[in-house]
Amino acid sequence: METTNLLLPSTRRTRMGMINRTFIEDAVIVSEKEQKKEHPNFIESNTSGITLEELETNCIVPSFGDNQLTISHQTFIHRIEEAASMFFAGETFGNTEIRVSHKILGRHPSALTKRKEELKPEDETIYYQRMAFCFHIRTICREMNGEEVHLCIGGVRSLNEENLYGKKSPEKFKIFIGWRVRVCSNLMLTCDGLTGRLEVMGDMDIYIAALKLFREFNLEQNLRLLENLGRTMISQEQFCQIIGRLRLYQVLPASQMKELPKVILGDSNINAATKGYIDNPNFGLRGRAKISCWDLMQLLNEAAKQSYIDKFLERNQNATDFAVGIQKALKGEDTENYGWFLR
């Protein structure tokens, strides 16, 4: 999706020298030249890849109506990287993967009278309205239900949530930490690994919020919760019942929907999960009579990768919560009415 706006030139915002970096020397960042691409993209729908260098050199930083700069995408990324490098000092980090969407085009004032076909690259300005990024910690890895998983950190920023025509106001970001499956790049986010919508006035607030999130995230407890999903099986009949109920859920009256767990997966996500049940080489049937709740979570998380950037994290967490809820219902421990999806 592309939108064309008339933008005045804006100074690019670079990394601020506010943070003493002496305490992060022990962290190791693996450069792109040293590491080849190892896995699929962590999100697919309507996005394209971009490097940090391209963000810094090719994209302007939009400003508010009072001409105060927004926090740039690259500054957001740098602050999370710095917080991770400090908190996980001594660990080795993989490349930072960046996905963007909704390109916003503009013109420099000197090119206002030019026709579109006359424009040269230097006449145009560009920035991306939505951006997501993540990087994994190569030295914090485990085996979970037969799959290699790494601890992964990242964030999402959507400028469409900001009122750029008004005065500078708190800017909105999302930060996450959680486990990611090596073979397919599926994130497995839980509520304690996601900040929700974080509103900040400056980039140091991002740094502080990231450290708080990392401190409160229990790696091993989270790992055990997810690994336990592999111990509960789902028959083909039960899977079909779940899919049918997920479709029915979307057209229920609001009064009835309030009595059920919240599900924010859409039709396209459910269709993708159904297709994956048949042909996903890692988590589908593969000639088996049953799949596990772990497989169900992966199918739903894989399907959530087809969401737009600004909806992706919430849908991923929702998919994880749903699989955990289904497991509890199957074990007779249901306290949130997930059993409705099995009836």
PLM segments and residue spans:
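Feature for intrinsically disordered/low-complexity regulatory segments and propeptides
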Residues: 2-81, 85-92, 96-100, 104
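A short acidic/basic microdomain associated with nuclease active sites
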Residues: 86-132
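Intrinsically disordered, low-complexity regions enriched in serine/threonine
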Residues: 1-40, 116-343
